């Protein structure tokens, strides 16, 4: 089976481990995009600590789960989103207002939709977490 998206596989592994009640999950291979996505999730308290393990190949990440995550997913293809259109995407992807985050990749880095609105930057939509 070929991998279509490393980020989608990583978020799928996190979702499955969270549903089965595991305390930690191993993600491999790793990438910079996965690490930045996990940093946004950690900043909002959806996951605990995570550790990058360099195995001189593609690397591994061990993520500590805290049971707060309901769902996280990837949006494929990565649609271009204007600042004015972010509100429409949050309404479509998230279950309620003020609940969860849409994660964007912008010229200023990977961030959630609220931070992108504050910094007044737009970009491509990566995924969501709630």
UniProtKB/Swiss-Prot annotation:
This protein's GO CC annotations: ribonucleoprotein complex; ribosome
Question: Which superkingdom heads the taxonomic lineage of this protein's source?
Answer: Eukaryota
Molecular function GO labels: structural constituent of ribosome
Tell me which Gene Ontology terms the entry assigns under biological process.
Answer: translation
Q: Which UniProt keywords apply?
A: Ribonucleoprotein, Ribosomal protein
Matching entries from InterPro entries are given as: Ribosomal_uS8, Ribosomal_uS8_CS, Ribosomal_uS8_sf
Family of the protein in this entry = Belongs to the universal ribosomal protein uS8 family.
Name the PANTHER family on file: 40S RIBOSOMAL PROTEIN S15A
Q: What is this protein called?
A: Small ribosomal subunit protein uS8
State the organism named in the record.
Kluyveromyces marxianus (Yeast)
